[in-house]
Amino acid sequence: MSRRNPCKFEIRGHCLNGKRCHFSHNYFEWPPHALLVRQNFMLNRILKSMDKSIDTLSEISGAAELDRTEEYALGVVGVLESYIGSINNITKQSACVAMSKLLTELNSDDIKKLRDNEELNSPKIRVYNTVISYIESNRKNNKQTIHLLKRLPADVLKKTIKNTLDIHKSITINNPKELTVSDTNDHAKNNDTT
């Protein structure tokens, strides 16, 4: 009985050729070396998905390096403002990743103070509650929050981003001492240009 060669796609993950593939997918026929390579690959994949120190955003949510260079050039707020204004070709994906980072910077207690200062029937209370719920969701699982934001229609996402940016600006105006990392970078860039 002749043994067929193991499928190289199956060794490194999963073969998508189906019945058209003429190589062996039967692990019992594979030589020990091929089994070890597959086992090592699968164990590394499991380890990577469990390790919190490794940034798996790009694999899980599709955040590519392009998104990160846009963010580096424009800053988190710049990416979001560009997405709202439909400039700089910012994708929905990169806007959602930037939104998640902005939500990480925001403190829900500051927003609750702003909410408590509003009148009872003010429509802003609903906006504050929405942003607070996104902050809490992002704190628990930022990848899931990015996924939820991506599923929003574009106009709803833009409105949510605009409301969040307005809240972020009002908080930074009220608390000028609490500058975020992105704000300090912007101030440093402005000082260099003058």
UniProtKB/Swiss-Prot annotation:
Using the record's annotations, give every residue carrying the modification Phosphoserine.
S58, S61
Q: Which GO terms describe its molecular function?
A: RNA binding; structural constituent of virion; zinc ion binding
**Chain residue ranges for the region called Oligomerization:** 32-49
Residues flagged as site, Involved in RNA-binding? K8, F9, F23, K92, R151
Residue span of region Disordered: 172-194
Enumerate the residue ranges forming zinc fingers (C3H1-type). Answer: 1-28
Keywords of this entry = Activation of host NF-kappa-B by virus, Elongation factor, Host cytoplasm, Host nucleus, Host-virus interaction, Metal-binding, Phosphoprotein, Protein biosynthesis, RNA-binding, Transcription, Transcription antitermination, Transcription regulation, Viral matrix protein, Viral transcription, Virion, Zinc, Zinc-finger
In residue numbers, the region (Globular core) covers 76-171
Q: Which PROSITE patterns match?
A: ZF_C3H1
GO BP, one annotated term: viral transcription
Q: Where is this region: Binding to the phosphoprotein?
A: 126-163
Q: How is it modified after translation?
A: Phosphorylated by host in infected cells. Only dephosphorylated M2-1 is competent for viral mRNA binding. Cyclic turnover of phosphorylation-dephosphorylation of M2-1 is required for efficient viral transcription.
Cellular component GO terms, alphabetical: host cell cytoplasm; host cell nucleus; virion component
Source domain of life: Viruses
Description of how the protein assembles with itself and partners: Homotetramer. The homotetramer interacts with RNA. Interacts with the phosphoprotein (P); this interaction is required for protein M2-1 function, localization in host inclusion bodies. Formation of a complex host PP1/M2-1/P allows P to target host PP1 phosphatase to the M2-1 substrate. Interacts with the nucleoprotein (N). Interacts with the matrix protein (M); this interaction directs M localization to cytoplasmic inclusions comprising viral proteins L, N, P, and M2-1 and mediates M association with the nucleocapsid. Interacts with host RELA. Interacts with host PABPC1 (via C-terminus).
Q: What's the stated role of this polypeptide?
A: Acts as a tetrameric transcription processivity factor that binds in a competitive manner to RNA and the phosphoprotein (P) to prevent premature termination during transcription. Transcription anti-terminator that enhances readthrough of intergenic junctions during viral transcription. Preferentially binds to poly(A)-rich sequences. Plays a role in the association of the matrix protein with the nucleocapsid, which initiates assembly and budding. Also, can activate host NF-kappa-B through association with host RELA.
What's said on domains?
Answer: Contains a zinc-finger domain on its N-terminus essential for its anti-termination function. Contains an oligomerization domain. The central globular core is responsible for binding to RNA and phosphoprotein.
Q: What is this protein called?
A: Protein M2-1
